[in-house]
Amino acid sequence: MRRRITTSDSGEPVAVLSSEALAAKEARLRELLANYRSVIVAFSGGADSAYLAWAATGVLGQSALCITADSPSYPDRHRQLALTVAREAGLRHEIIQTSELERAEYRANPTNRCYYCKHELYTSLTTLASDRGFAVVADGSNADDRGDYRPGRQAAREFRVRSPLDEAGLTKAEIRELSRRAGLRTWDEPASACLSSRIPYHSEVTPEKLRSIERAEEVLRTLGFRVCRVRHHELTASGNGSPSTLARLEIAAEELPRALAPEIRSRIVGEILAVGYQHVTIDLQGYRMGSLNEGLRLDPI
């Protein structure tokens, strides 16, 4: 079987199935969606959930409702992207407020923090589905997620949330290819996660930290860096002083030379200090998905 080679979010080559095999997976997805009869799609605005929302709308029309969660944990740019995609794709779309920050377990930032976030989200979505007569709640998990540490999947199982992209065997690269063919602007949208993922485990999640992270990442995006993270660290103070904050910048390896150019580096440092950080450092290893998991023994969920 012939495969086309493309690149993943990390720049690594990945195989995409032949057109015939990919069409078979797409047909399987549509069959799954048709069997739902009605569905609420958890729609973050990212590549996976955007494609699922588009496909569900194509199969079920107004019986597909796409819901975007809004809270301090999510960057405003994600909400704006979701609104734009919904408008362009003709989705039936609503935004709801979630309150994961009101949960002490979430704020404590354990290694399974994502479980509490998804538990909050799926509580809201399943209640909404029950109240408004939708048969299924679905998320955008794909086949590549199976071997990863994703505590949110435990919550999905508990609430019987379906993952039709995964069930159809679609990988991230295949979803990007199908999204490109569908004309979705999200086809090459870099993978992302909630802002809390930038805070080391067991360091409290607060609205103030999340705002600082969002503002600092916006500095990098305004300067043209598409794949980037600002990791928020607190440095222990000597004596009785307050801890200081450090922004550790992860930028895609191929973009590091530009970030280190004197003029750009000066702008990065100045503008991120203006956000409120006391220290700014660029991680020479570059961007790594889930870098705060490094060194931890986490089994796939």
Language-model region placement:
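Small/polar glycine-rich anion-binding or flexible loop at a beta-alpha turn
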Residues: 231-246, 283-289
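Short, low-order "capping/linker" segments at domain edges
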Residues: 290-301
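ATP-dependent adenylation/nucleotidyltransferase module used to activate substrates
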Residues: 2-181, 247, 261-277, 282, ...
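Mid-to-C-terminal catalytic subdomains of enzymes
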Residues: 170, 174-220, 224-229, 238-243
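A short, flexible beta-alpha/helix-coil linker loop
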Residues: 101, 200-202, 253-256
